[in-house]
A protein has these predicted regions:
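Conserved donor nucleotide-binding strand/loop of the catalytic core
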Residues: 42-71
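Catalytic-site signature of metal-activated, phosphate-bearing donor transferases
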Residues: 62-69, 80, 86-171
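Short, well-formed alpha-helical segments that are part of the catalytic scaffolds
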Residues: 6-26
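A conserved acidic beta->alpha catalytic loop
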Residues: 22, 34-44, 57, 81, ...
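Acidic helix N-cap motif at the loop->helix transition within catalytic regions
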Residues: 14-18, 39-48, 89
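Short beta-strand/loop segment that forms part of the nucleotide-sugar
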Residues: 7, 28-36, 53, 82
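Short aromatic/hydrophobic "clamp" motif used to bind/position activated sugar donors
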Residues: 77
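Extreme N-terminal starter segment of soluble prokaryotic enzymes
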Residues: 1-4
Length: 171
């Protein structure tokens, strides 16, 4: 079983390296799709993978995500954003769960980090991010969601992946 990380980015040079350093600790195929960065995002990405592609932004997050998935070599896709950092993955348990649930969508635990009035807060949520490449896709121009390719309903399961999300933090 091969797992690919699919990531879309734009002007993420400040976040991307931290995310990729953690991803590179695992044997994943990494695909990064740049949707029009004007900073050094692409240069940072190329330090970690040769699978960096340009995509002309068309105001549709699902299309960009699906393009990234189309470039992935793995049978399974794990979607991670540039402002998310892997805190933990139980690889052995993950492989077992994927094999048992290959027609379902895996829900990772995302810990959103943010500050307000000098105080730090976190908010935990489960998000659909792990799925079989040939069974699922993204739909929705904004607030894109994982959908079954034939638009059938699907079940989910929790996977042993924890991501810290720093996108709500002020730089």
């Amino acid at each position: 079983m091969k797992l690919s990380i699919a990531m879309i980015v734009k002007n993420e040079e400040k976040n991307l390296e931290k995310s990729l350093k953690e991803i590179c600790k695992y044997d994943f195929d990494i695909v990064i799709v740049d949707t029009g960065s004007t900073d050094k995002t692409k240069e940072v990405a190329l330090k970690y993978t040769k699978n960096v592609f340009e995509y002309k932004w068309c105001n549709d997050f699902a299309k960009a995500r699906n393009f990234s998935i189309s470039k992935a070599k793995g049978d399974y896709i794990l979607v991670i954003d540039a402002d998310e950092v892997i805190e933990s993955i139980d690889i052995n348990n993950l492989k077992t769960l994927i094999n048992k649930n290959n027609n379902k969508v895996g829900r990772i635990l995302r810990i959103n980090q943010y500050s307000r009035n000098g105080e730090r807060f976190t908010y935990k949520e489960r998000v659909n991010r792990l799925f079989k490449k040939d069974k699922f896709k993204y739909s929705g121009r904004i607030h894109e969601q994982v959908t079954e390719i034939n638009n059938k309903s699907y079940d989910t399961y929790n996977v042993p992946i924890v991501l810290n999300h720093y996108g709500y933090e002020k730089n």
